[in-house]
């Protein structure tokens, strides 16, 4: 995934466009649900949607709508590619927004290894990270990685910050 994200924009656009065109031709695909923050941040899906005629929804569509509602947000994502794309989207939608973000690839790897959410949240000290975010003025925590709903309920019980998870709003946008 990281190798793809750091490849040239032309290579990424060509690969994604070919994949989506194949889905259209083979399966009659009319919509695409891109459930990956770092991929969404490394490829501009607007031109691809126009070229293919597909309705494409990404987590960034949700962040674009959320940004004007806040003055300060905390973002946790899988890696710097993910945080960069999320930050670019949020700040384009609300240039006055204060952002603090963290890439947490070790958390992603723990999820993929099957570590229980309770242990993962404690071992990676996520409540302490969120307490710091709150202490510096964050109004909410953005789950900027689609792996992170795995521990969302456990973390929510241990922090005061509201958690923003784009998944449900993405489904609504896809059906709109």
Regions found by a protein language model. Give the residues of each.
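Non-catalytic structural scaffold of enzyme domains
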Residues: 1-176
């Amino acid at each position: 995934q990281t190798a793809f994200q750091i490849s040239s924009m032309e290579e990424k656009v060509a690969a994604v466009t070919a994949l989506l065109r194949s889905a259209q031709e083979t399966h009659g695909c009319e919509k695409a649900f891109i459930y990956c923050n770092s991929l969404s941040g490394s490829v501009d899906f607007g031109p691809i949607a126009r070229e293919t005629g597909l309705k494409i929804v990404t987590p960034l569509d949700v962040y674009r709508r959320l940004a004007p509602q806040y003055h300060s947000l905390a973002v946790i994502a899988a890696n710097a590619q993910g945080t960069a794309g999320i930050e670019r989207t949020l700040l384009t939608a609300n240039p006055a927004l204060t952002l603090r973000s963290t890439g947490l690839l070790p958390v992603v790897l723990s999820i993929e290894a099957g570590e229980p959410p309770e242990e993962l949240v404690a071992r990676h000290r996520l409540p302490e990270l969120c307490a710091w975010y709150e202490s510096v003025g964050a109004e909410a925590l953005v789950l900027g990685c689609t792996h992170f709903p795995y521990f969302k309920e456990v973390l929510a019980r241990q922090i005061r910050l509201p958690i923003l998870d784009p998944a449900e709003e993405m489904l609504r946008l896809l059906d709109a």
